[in-house]
Amino acid sequence: MLENISSGVGYDRWTAISYAWSADQHSVSAAPSAGVTNALGSGLDIPSQTACRSCHNMTGADAVIGFNALQLNHDDGALTLADLLLRGTLVNGSTGNPANVSLDNAVFPGDAKARAALGYLHGNCGHCHGGPTPRAEQRLGSVIGMTELQDAPIMDSAVCKCLQNWRGRENDFGGFYTLRVSPGHAELSGIIGRMSSRVRGEQMPPVGTNRVDQTGLATVRAWIDSLNSSSCDANPPSCPAP
């Protein structure tokens, strides 16, 4: 173990603190606000408080990420959406009224590849690339009530859309990434290039990770490769040259 994170609600705000484990794994102590580099010689870092807040508050919706209806609707044990609905404790924080959510509409659409990829992007990217003001106007999170793959925000904001803020990066084939998601061509998709990088200023997620998530990368890659490669042809994007 390297780190435990504790979050709680105070009188008017969220508070959070990271605890670093001792080398003998018998105790923890509050990590310094600047974080810890190469914690216990693992090659992994405990992020600084500033780095933590860059994600835990990005959209202004809430400080907690990874705790929403879509992610809780599973059968893997522990706390689930079904538990919260049964207890009657699930509420819409913006109105105080019971949330209009059910086990039927809190689902990811599409086939198995699409559901896996949308779930991964929602949980790992959608908290910054989502909400009322998504980063780079790219929506990678999903919403309750989706019934078809075309309903997913990524289909409108990333598939066949030109890259922004990351132009001129060379891909595996000596060319340049131009589209965020190039249907049928994961190797040409900027989102894959970002996920594959661990270069500061290029990698995604931008903080809190210094190793590529190979399983997640393969999941998103498989979905992009399964998309119809001609889906951009009806309205080909005119992207500026790198």
Where would I find each of the regions flagged by the language model?
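Electron-transfer interface patches adjacent to heme c in soluble/periplasmic c-type cytochromes
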Residues: 9, 74-118, 127-242
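Generic signature of intrinsically disordered, low-complexity segments enriched in small/polar residues
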Residues: 22-24, 68-70, 123, 176, ...
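The −1 position to Zn-ligating cysteines in a subset of zinc-ribbon hairpins
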Residues: 51, 124, 203
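Extended surface/linker regions that mediate inter-domain or inter-protein docking
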Residues: 1-119
